[in-house]
Regions:
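N-terminal regions of ATP-driven nucleic-acid and macromolecular assemblies
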Residues: 1-282
């Protein structure tokens, strides 16, 4: 939902699972990553791939874990557009780039998914440009043509790439509204429902929306002794150091029948060794 809430770390896990060989529990595929936030860390991704590869016995002929990791990394295609317009152009060029065997090593692999981290990167600049265009259009002397909506173009480009490559799109975004705090009167999110912050048509673009956040640590009670507060603080610090996160379905705009099928979530830990998944929970 916000920077540091585990979204990119969860993407590392998904990417590692996608590019590892099937003999090690992976999908032996390729991934395209549009890193508009510039937050992707190759050493961290490498660490996650090594961690997953090391959890399964190395089959004969697979080579060492380091060799397997290096081979898997060659199938992660990281692109870093610097503006909304360049992101649109990059998304439009994906089919041409990936279907040319001379461009990369993944021609014989299918694309597991296209990732965009994050769709919110250019939100404020887009909003400022939109407001400026509206202001200019409202002046009598302005004869400029309205500019195409960048977010509409990006949504269309990603959908076209998804269809052409037979690959789903995974995108992250930030929650730009108020943050839930049950201790503050006047605002509280109901259940697991968060209204999407991105402009149209992005509210209706995803088939499934997930909320990822650090597992909340309850606040200290008001009536508590100093000794109890010290012990409680130590326990709270241990919980924070675990790097525990939770992921659950965003119920905004989802009908009840679909919710009954999807009402579950999972927890994961972000550690120095990488992301460790917990079992699914109801």
């Amino acid at each position: 939902m916000a920077p540091g809430d585990g979204k990119t770390s969860l993407l590392y896990h998904l990417i590692a699972t996608a590019v590892l060989p099937s003999a090690l529990g992976g999908r032996q595929a390729a991934v395209v990553m549009l890193d508009t936030d510039g937050r992707l860390s190759v050493p961290r991704l490498r660490q996650q791939i090594q961690s997953l590869a090391g959890r399964s016995p190395q089959p004969d002929g697979c080579g060492s874990i380091d060799e397997t990791t290096l081979s898997a990394l060659k199938h992660v295609h990281v692109l870093r557009p610097q503006s909304l317009a360049s992101t649109v152009a990059t998304a439009r060029s994906l089919e041409k780039y990936l279907l040319n065997a001379d461009n990369h090593n993944s021609f014989e692999r299918h694309i597991a998914f296209i990732a965009l981290d994050s769709a919110s990167s250019f939100y404020w600049q887009h909003r400022a440009d939109t407001e400026e265009s509206a202001l200019m259009a409202g002046t009598a002397s302005s004869k400029s043509m309205p500019q195409p909506n960048g977010y509409v173009q990006l949504a269309a480009a990603l959908k076209n790439a998804s269809r052409a490559l037979h690959a789903p799109v995974i995108f992250t975004s930030w929650h730009l509204g108020p943050v839930r705090d049950p201790n503050v009167n006047g605002f509280a999110l109901e259940g697991h429902s968060v209204r999407p912050s991105l402009p149209p048509p992005w509210q209706d673009l995803p088939t499934l929306r997930l909320i990822v956040q650090r597992t909340p640590v309850r606040k200290l009670p008001v009536e508590i002794s100093l000794e109890e507060a010290r012990q409680e603080s130590e326990q709270r610090q241990r919980v924070v150091e675990q790097g525990r996160f939770e992921c659950f379905v965003n119920e905004w705009g989802v009908d009840e029948r679909t919710l009954q099928a999807l009402r579950s979530g999972f927890e994961f830990y972000v550690t120095q060794e990488g992301v460790r998944m917990e079992n699914s929970k109801d």
